[in-house]
Amino acid sequence: VLDGKVRDGNVRDGKARDGKVRDGKARDGKVRDGNVRDGEGGTPMTDTAVRIVGNTLRLPGGAAVRFVRTLRLPETGTHALPPGLGEFPVRRVADYPDTAPAEWRARGGVMLPVYLREAMWLSFAGSARPTALQVGVGKVCAVSGKPWSDRLSQRPQNYLVLPRQPWLDGINSGNGTVRQFVSVPLGLGATVEGQVTGEEVWGGVQLQSFPLSEEALAEHHRQERLRRGRLGRQRMRGSRSAGGFGAAPPMMSAAPAAPAASAAPAPGAAPSPRMGLGVGGSMRQEVYEDDRPLRDWSETPAGRVFVHLVTPPEWRRVTGEAPPPSPVDRAAYTRAGLPWYDYYDEDARDLAPTDALEAVKPVGDWLGEDLEPWQQPSPEQVIPLKDPPGKPVEDGDW
């Protein structure tokens, strides 16, 4: 939604039901892409290349990840899924050798701008094949609460299964809920990293992908051919196609962009240029249990990327670009009658919560009460739902 109207009522982040991307182009119509290299001054990666196409990170093995702006939820109660309000711009750290801090260059990866206390979610629309994706927040697993690891685990599970998992809005809190990702500066102790580990060293977001083994991938392709054959016969009989494991579910539309106001930082204390993720309100979203045996996945990651979260002033200083406008007013969004969403997969099992993540407190305990107006959406507003490669992104030492 770019003009305040819902295009088809079944899109959350620009991926429409017909498979066409409504908002997949960069703001100027050009695809900004690039390879990420392995450390400062390193050589380009080949098989392990993470690439940027538009604002989408494409990891080896088929995972696609976009960072989506959204409405911040109140820290009390459990809410429907908030909408997408457009993508965060993503840039390679290696493209700014003269302005990016040495610490960023050493870690490699990409950067994106966030306001203090801004909410985000991760979209996996466009993920091409089954992939186990690890998501870290300050090198703490957002699924298990365990320290970052280069190996997959199922006790507890420390990864998401794509494309079955269509998106991730926050850390796993079990019982069909997650707690929203909210940006905070390092140094307060408010990040998930600070609360779980007792220190704030890394910040940012970490992504790591594991493809299926060759044998499991061959079996997956065989099952997909059988599934497509069944769907084709169903369509010929006029029946409705089922969701299935092999394709991501339909997403929701981007909400109206915030007005083009001056890109001033959000109210509150001036944040550090280094940002991490804390948690905000709770929402109805499941983190799905993997129904494959662990042996189906590769033992080593195919690729990884460090995502630096930076303040708007630091973004402007490093890139020379204006950051996106301040986030849209959430009460005004709801008053306008625009949609919120519910998503439930009856064929999947939700992961149980972990002690480490259950103990994480909301950022309001550090930043103060959330005074932004809130208006509960009406039941009618809650909608139930069921490219060529670019240059590689540089990896580094983290």
Indicate where each model-derived feature is located.
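Long, intrinsically disordered low-complexity tandem-repeat segments
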Residues: V1-E40
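Intrinsically disordered, low-complexity segments enriched in small/polar residues
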Residues: P44-W398
